[in-house]
């Protein structure tokens, strides 16, 4: 059926959905919205289209078709119709990688598709906007607490970040899913239903855990917000110290594929942090490897390092990763 979309009105320019886009995009003359057809990215594209037209900026929609469901062709047609309606070009990347459902190959699939996704983003040479909202942040909090990782950023996302040399902007990160749905319904914006399976961990958090917490005491989630805001200052301070320490780590390029990193075990920052898994995960991400060792592997390394030193030894952290441990240094070898 024909979409009876409400026209953008003067009062819409003062709404938070619009003003957040305006604040975050002011310095850019070109930007793209990664659109899936879900309510978040559909509403985001609506406001971004209005912003681009009003300010004479270049705007486009980009979509990755994973071809992993029978309905994918219909979804692409839906997005094409939407792009014509808001007068924005739609660029599509077709994925032809078959996903193996076994956990054994899941990491390889996710790593490969992530690289393709960010290479696609990078090809446009502009910031990419994503429709993540506050509910996504809450899901990340519980996922990170469950995995005992990313204590330095439990939300797992920020309004602006740089990932794989791509500027990522999330204008709706402080907006609730409910407010986004209500606004989309008011504006008659069509959208596809959430495809996250109800049986998945994310689905259970979205459909059961978070609603249960809200029913028990809605102030609990607000408390998470305030806690993260309060600790952000300390996170930023720690990150500055981490970056200074990281610059002091000696890198030795042995060949095109082999590198080593020497860590001073008596360095004050190292001594204060080496027993924290988040420290090792943060350090690992700076090495820009395609995959990382498991949490279990990092815990085993920490237990090894906590043991009083008696003699030189070698610790295997993962495939092609070994660590030579001496009294005063760690030498990490990557192959």
What are these model-derived regions, one by one?
Residues 97-100, 190-191, 273:
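A short, flexible beta-alpha/helix-coil linker loop
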Residues 44, 75, 201, 205, ...:
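Hydrophobic (often cysteine-bearing) scaffold residues that line and stabilize catalytic clefts
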Residues 127-131, 136-227:
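Catalytic subdomain that performs nucleotidyl-dependent activation
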Residues 14-37, 60, 161-164, 229-335:
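AMP-forming adenylation/ATP pyrophosphatase catalytic core
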Residues 2-148, 178, 185-186:
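ATP-dependent adenylation/nucleotidyltransferase module used to activate substrates
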Residues 55, 214-219, 285-293:
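Short helix-capping/linker segments at secondary-structure and domain boundaries
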Residues 69, 111, 169-170, 199, ...:
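A generic secondary-structure micro-motif detector
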């Amino acid at each position: 059926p024909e979409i009876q979309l409400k026209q953008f009105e003067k009062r819409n320019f003062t709404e938070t959905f619009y003003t957040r886009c305006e604040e975050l995009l002011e310095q850019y003359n070109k930007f793209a919205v990664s659109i899936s057809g879900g309510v978040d990215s559909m509403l985001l594209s609506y406001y971004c289209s209005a912003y681009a037209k009003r300010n004479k900026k270049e705007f486009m929609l980009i979509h990755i078709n994973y071809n992993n469901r029978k309905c994918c062709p219909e979804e692409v047609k839906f997005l094409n119709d939407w792009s014509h309606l808001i007068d924005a070009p739609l660029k599509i990347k077709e994925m032809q990688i078959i996903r193996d459902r076994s956990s054994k190959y899941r990491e390889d699939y996710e790593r490969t598709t992530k690289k393709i996704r960010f290479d696609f983003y990078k090809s446009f040479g502009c910031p990419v906007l994503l429709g993540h909202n506050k509910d996504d942040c809450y899901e990340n909090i519980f996922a990170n607490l469950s995995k005992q990782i990313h204590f330095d950023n439990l939300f797992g996302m920020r309004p602006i970040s740089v990932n794989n040399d791509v500027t990522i902007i999330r204008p709706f990160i402080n907006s609730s899913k409910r407010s986004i749905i209500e606004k989309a319904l008011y504006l008659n914006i069509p959208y596809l239903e959430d495809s996250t399976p109800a049986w998945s961990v994310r689905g259970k958090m979205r459909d059961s855990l978070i609603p249960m917490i809200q029913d028990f005491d809605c102030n609990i989630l607000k408390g998470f917000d305030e806690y993260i805001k309060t600790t952000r200052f300390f996170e930023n301070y720690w990150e500055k110290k981490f970056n200074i320490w990281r610059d002091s780590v000696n890198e030795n390029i042995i060949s095109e594929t082999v590198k080593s990193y020497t860590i001073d075990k008596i360095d004050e920052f190292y001594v204060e942090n080496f027993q924290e898994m988040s420290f090792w995960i943060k350090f690992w991400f700076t090495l820009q490897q395609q995959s990382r060792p498991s949490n279990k592997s990092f815990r085993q390394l920490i237990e090894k390092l906590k043991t009083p030193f008696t003699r030189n030894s070698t610790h295997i952290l993962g495939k092609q990763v070994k660590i030579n441990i001496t009294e005063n240094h760690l030498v990490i070898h990557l192959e």
